[in-house]
């Protein structure tokens, strides 16, 4: 079970890092509303550019914490719970703008991975 947690925390972390560093300016097909990049997506949700960067910095920080958690297990659970909370928010934003369910697939996937990481990793021996 511990391996499920570790694989999940790595998967969630790499997914978030990929979105914020490799796909930031790309139209992925999963963007909210009619957005074609991250800035437009946050505008669709009614958030400012500053809010976008704050959310991004927090998500990236949580993703890094999940990776560091491979060596410092006690930080995994709080980081995973924090990331899961952001994914619940992302699901809410997709619903707010009336997106089809498929656009929520990445957020639902990271929510699932974060939940598994919180349950099966973080301080367990």
Predicted regions and their residues:
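Short amphipathic, positively biased membrane-proximal segments
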Residues: 1-125
